[in-house]
Amino acid sequence: MEVMQPFVEEGREIICFSISDSMSTSGNVMRLAAEELEASDKVTVINSANLSTGIGLQVIQAAILASEGKTAAEITTAIEAIRPKVRASFVVDTLTYLHRGGRCSAVAALAGGMLKLHPRIVVVDGAMDASKKYRGKLSSVILSYTRDMEEDLKNAVPDRVFITHSGCDREIVEAVRSYLERL
């Protein structure tokens, strides 16, 4: 609310992107803040139906449209049109956090760790789902994961492909970057 208030006072239109409504209440919190500021007519909350970089891709497009002078309504319509084209997925290095988040049992996390399983998590229709399980050393898994996405990557807007990671070895990131540049 504190972030919105100065813009509301200036009478500006505000567009907020939330993590997928099925994963978080952040969108609802933003809508409630707009109501409390009596600015529901000036604040548009867009359910990204995604997370992390998937939201970022939509925000980049919205910023481009805003710089072209588009209204919040025009931007919202354009974002809703590209939302189904946004792909976000990742491979987890450990099942510990999936277990802690209630997404897998303790037995599955233990067995998966012993077998060196690394599930590919995809965001589909605003929800996370495991689409494939890789097995082995993380560096090999990530390269296999990248190769499995080749068709989607070839059809992507080249300057909108992100390598998003959390503490991944620099060598792995560079290997993925090199692979992508050769596509």
For the regions a language model picked out, list residue spans one by one.
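Glycine-rich oxoanion-binding loops at beta->alpha junctions
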Residues: 1-7
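Mixed-charge interfacial surface used for oligomerization/domain docking
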Residues: 15, 22-44, 50-183
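Glycine-rich phosphate-binding loop signature in dinucleotide/nucleotide-binding domains
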Residues: 7-13
